[in-house]
Amino acid sequence: MSRSGVAVADESLTAFNDLKLGKKYKFVLFGLNADKTSIIVKETSNERDYDVFLEKLPEDDCLYAVYDFEYEISGAEGKRSKIVFFTWSPDTAPIRSKMVYASSKDALRRALNGVSSDIQGTDFSEVAYESVLEKVSRGAGSH
């Protein structure tokens, strides 16, 4: 339960574990239910194109997401995969929505074991592939 009184629905944990352990999904989008009491799964996808993920982020509302982010490391290290947690809170979202999402984030984040990076996005430049790549690849060899 978060400071805002919002709980994490079991389906959210199940979807996350399906992404993390079962590699069933490439990304999962989470949001609040209609009465803003629970964090639920809004959508799951196995689409590998990062741009498809970005298109799912609303221009005028908040959401959370986890993405199985794959990238290459130069040299012999090859491909890496890291699970990234996104808090999407665009400047154009309603203030009330931003407040509830901000105060509920920790409950979801603590429930998702195995996330390696957190990205806070208020505009698309902050969640662009290159921006995320720079953050997740720090300390993982040169890129």
Curated annotation (Swiss-Prot):
Localization, UniProt: Cytoplasm; Cytoplasm, Cytoskeleton; Nucleus matrix
InterPro entries (UniProt xref): ADF-H, ADF-H/Gelsolin-like_dom_sf, ADF/Cofilin
Transmembrane segments: none
Family: Belongs to the actin-binding proteins ADF family.
Pfam family, one: Cofilin_ADF
Lineage: Eukaryota, Fungi, Dikarya, Ascomycota, Saccharomycotina
GO biological process terms held by the UniProt record: actin filament depolymerization; actin filament severing; cell division; endocytosis; Golgi to plasma membrane protein transport
CDD domains found in the cross-reference section: ADF_cofilin_like (cd11286)
A GO term for molecular function: actin filament binding
UniProt keyword Hydrolase present: no
Species name: Eremothecium gossypii (strain ATCC 10895 / CBS 109.51 / FGSC 9923 / NRRL Y-1056)
Record function comment: Controls reversibly actin polymerization and depolymerization in a pH-sensitive manner. It has the ability to bind G- and F-actin in a 1:1 ratio of cofilin to actin. Binding to F-actin is regulated by tropomyosin. It is the major component of intranuclear and cytoplasmic actin rods. Required for accumulation of actin at the cell division site via depolymerizing actin at the cell ends. In association with myosin II has a role in the assembly of the contractile ring via severing actin filaments. Involved in the maintenance of the contractile ring once formed.
Nucleus recorded as keyword: yes
ADF-H domain location: 5-137
Protein's name according to its UniProt entry: Cofilin
Entry keyword set: Actin-binding, Cell cycle, Cell division, Cytoplasm, Cytoskeleton, Nucleus
GO cellular component: actin cortical patch; actin cytoskeleton; cytoplasm; nuclear matrix
Domain of life: Eukaryota
